[in-house]
Amino acid sequence: MTALNELTLAEARDGLKAKDFSAREIAQAHLDAIERAKALNAYIVATPDRALKMADVSDEKIAKGEARPLEGLPLGIKDLFATQGVHTTAGSKILEGFEPHYESNVSSQLWRDGAVMLGKLNLDEFAMGSSNETSAYGKTISPWRRQGSDTPLVPGGSSGGSAAAVAAHLCLGATATDTGGSIRQPAAFTGTVGIKPTYGRCSRWGIIAYASSLDQAGPIARTVQDCAILLGSMAGHDPRDTTSVDVPVPDFEAAITRGVKGLTIGIPKEYRVEGMPAEIQRLWDQGADWLREAGATVREISLPHTQYALPAYYIVAPAEASSNLARYDGVRYGLRVPGRDIAGMYENTRAAGFGREVKRRIMIGTYVLSAGYYDAYYVRAQKIRTLIKRDFEAAYASGIDAILTPATPSAAFGIGEMASADPVEMYLNDVFTVTVNMAGLPGISVPAGLDAQGLPLGLQLIGRPFDEETLFAAAQTIENAAGRISLPKAWWA
C-alpha cells in the first residue's frame, strides 16, 4: 500500500471520502515525514497541534456527510502568507517574532474548504531569490541529487521550501507566490507542477509584498490535477485587494480532460537563447511533438521585446520593493535594534534585519526611483513592459491559444555554486519566466523529463489572461505523454 504522505492530493481526497483512512491519520503521516526530513529545512515552523485539531474537525465533517472540497487534505503554506497566531517571517530576520492577528485571503479560503495546515515553508528572504539561499532561517535543500553525487542542490526560489516539501512528500500541495518565476522555476527544479495564475486571479491581501504589480499567489503540487484542485480554492474576488479581479472561478479540474485538439500552440523564436543546453532544446522540441500528436497545431511566433524583459524586470521589481520594504522599521512589530535616536533605531534595525540580497534590491530600487534617474531607468522599464504585453496580445490575436517554452535555462545547480558569481548570473535563471509577470499572464510549469544527470526539467505553457483552463488542458497532455517523474530514494530519512 502507498504511504499516506505519498498519495496525490486527488487520491487522498478520494480516500478520505471513501473512509479508507482518517484525516488525523494522513495528517500524522505528513507530520512524521516532516520530522524525518529536517535535513531539507523545507519548513521554518511546523504546526503539529494545529494540524491535528484541524484534522479532527475534518473527520467530524466527513462522518456527518458534510465534507468540504479540500476536507482533511494537509498543505504547507509559504511563509509569505500571513497566518493568524502563527509565526510569519517572509524568511527575514526583521520579522523575527511576528505573529499576525489576521489571516491571508488565500489561506483563509483553503481553511474554509477544509484543508489542514502543516506549517510554514521556507523561502528566499522577502521572496527575493532564485535558489532559496537567501533565507535568514537557513537554506532549503532539494530532495533531488545528481546521479552518483552527494552534492546538495538548490530547490529553486523563491518558493523553494514549497517545491521541496511537495517533491519530498512533506505535504500534498503548497501555496507559493510568483513575482518573476518563483513558482515555475522551483517547480521545474524539483519535478513538481506549479502555476502562476493571471494577475488578479488570487487575492494578494495578507501576502507580504515584494513587487505589488507583479506578485501573484498560486499552488505547487505533484500533478496537474492537484494544482487545478488547489487553484479552485485559492482563486476568487476579494474586495480588500484593489488588484483582485471580479471574474467567475471556473472548474479548473474539469478542464484537464479537454485535450488540445484544435488548439494552436506558439513557439517563440526569441526564447532560443544563446548557450541553451542541447537537452533543453530537445525537451522543448519533444513537448511540441507531444502537443502536435495530441491534435494541436504548432507554429513559430515572434515576441520581439523578449530580450529587454530581464533588465526591465530588475528595474521595476526592485523599485517596488524599495517602497514596500520601507515599512519595516522596528517600530510596530518584528526586530528592533536600539539607536541613539529614532533615525538611529531605523538604521540599526534595517541594517541588522535585512539580508544582503534584500539590501541590494532596495538600493537598486531607490537608485532607479531617484530624481536624476527616474526617467532614464524606471520610466523606460515601464515602457518596455507595455511593449512586452503588446507582443503577447498580438500573438493571441493572431490565433495562438497558448505558448510553449522551456521553464528554466538549466536543471538545478548546487548549493553555493553561484555564491561567487556576478548577481546577474543568478538573475538569468528567470530569463524564461519574467515576461509572464511583466504582462500579467498565467503560466504553468510541468515536469517533462530528466537531464543527463537525472535531474528534472520542466516545460512552461503561457496562456491568455484568465484562461488557466487551456493551460491545464495542455499541461495534462504533456504530463500524460511524459509520465509522472518519480523522486529518487529518500536519502534524508
From Swiss-Prot:
It is an enzyme of class 6 (ligase). GO terms for cellular component: glutamyl-tRNA(Gln) amidotransferase complex. PROSITE patterns: AMIDASES. InterPro entries: Amidase (IPR000120), Amidase_CS (IPR020556), Amidase_dom (IPR023631), AS_sf (IPR036928), GatA (IPR004412). GO terms for biological process: translation. The keyword Signal does not apply. Pfam families: Amidase. It catalyses: L-glutamyl-tRNA(Gln) + L-glutamine + ATP + H2O = L-glutaminyl-tRNA(Gln) + L-glutamate + ADP + phosphate + H(+). It comes from the Bacteria. The active site is at 78 (charge relay system), 158 (charge relay system), 182 (acyl-ester intermediate). Disulfide bonds: none annotated. Keywords: ATP-binding, Ligase, Nucleotide-binding, Protein biosynthesis. The keyword ATP-binding applies. Its EC number is 6.3.5.7. One of its GO terms (molecular function) is ATP binding. Heterotrimer of A, B and C subunits. Belongs to the amidase family. GatA subfamily. Allows the formation of correctly charged Gln-tRNA(Gln) through the transamidation of misacylated Glu-tRNA(Gln) in organisms which lack glutaminyl-tRNA synthetase. The reaction takes place in the presence of glutamine and ATP through an activated gamma-phospho-Glu-tRNA(Gln). This is Glutamyl-tRNA(Gln) amidotransferase subunit A. It comes from Methylorubrum populi (strain ATCC BAA-705 / NCIMB 13946 / BJ001). The lineage of its organism: Bacteria, Pseudomonadati, Pseudomonadota, Alphaproteobacteria, Hyphomicrobiales.
